[in-house]
Amino acid sequence: YGPLIVLEPGQKYDLEHDKTFVFSIGRYAPFGSMLIVNGTPEPDPVELKTGTIYRLRLINITTNESDLRVRLEGEGAPVQWKVIASDGADLPAALLKSSAADMGLTVGSTRDIEYESDREGHVEMKISAPGFEALIMQPFDIVFAK
């Protein structure tokens, strides 16, 4: 699993601050079809640092499925994030604003999210789809930036 990310001439991919998540449907016995993240039903935690801005690239490649619901939460409630790009195009400055981290993501679409935490702890990206009893969680461990 991996995306094709197109950058502007001279722009470099920032491996430390860009985190990509590809959502799809996998077949894992004995469960049948289930949501997976980056090719696995049990993704490893991603370590983030406090005070650091990250670009979370969300890509929905599920086929013939309903829209996904993506929610990033800490302590049971959505955290704040900022949608900065949609389907490969940066959003105009007038549309850039922080909001509760909860949105729909249609089949074949992408969203780039800006996320920064000011405190240590654990947050989870919860991905769900209508018709699937279970949801999948991508854990994040936020550590103090040294």
What is the role of each PLM region?
Residues 1-146:
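Copper-binding active sites and cupredoxin-like electron-transfer domains
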